[in-house]
Amino acid sequence: MKLLTKAWYQTMQDSGMGVMLQVDERAAECSEELFQAVWEEKLAEDLELRREMCAEFEEVFDEAQERQSFAEQHRWEMEYYRTRMPESILNQVADLRVLALGYCTEAVFRALKEYRAWCETWTEKTMDEAWKMRCSQGLESAFTGEHSLHDSVVLSLQREGEDLRMEFDREDPMERLRDIRENDPELLEEMGEEPFLFPEIRAICFRDAEILKQEQCVEKAFWLYDEIWRTEEGGFEIHALLWKDNGVFELTIRCRDTELLWTVPQADIP
């Protein structure tokens, strides 16, 4: 990726940093007594919420498991703030443990609000630049056109002679329609069949292709964002940003051309 990089994606995620924090001036001090008090307070709230949810959905409430999950989430929050929060803001935090439980001072709250605004502005500006670069190459409708692959799950990437074929996890449109017929016939009568037979990209064939960069196995990865660039030879480079449980990674494929395969014939696309 040249513009929509891993750093760009992480900054976009940071635009939500601390959005659920509450101002509590107790967070201005660092003491074991305060931390334990806040811990018990937040743990009690979490357990009560989980207990109510289990009762509503008729599930077994496992307090020991919920306590463990609470502690694991707290560790995750601490690591996130420690590694992602700007140092200038982190230095204002008296006790990271209390911050990870959801409390901060007014000064930290305001600083994070400004940082979130900067993240949002910068990521949107970069997204606009990526689109302008695509348009400047005459590639507005190239690759997938108006059909986004965002959040599509990759099933496989396999070599077929000189080509590469990438398959996506897609629901069969007829299966979707049968499900609606069985479970919501009134909706089908109201809307008709056509809205449920919408086309989706089920596979992409990269013609005369080579992989220039593949940081992880793409199987079961979520496709996030992509860029397309013309090559000097007249072909294309497809840059993709994908996500799996162990993080975001990049895939770059150079090819002569691409062919899209649909869940319904392309000629039938409205």
Walk through the language-model features, giving the residues of each.
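Surface-exposed, interaction-prone regions used to assemble/regulate multi-protein complexes
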Residues: M1-P270
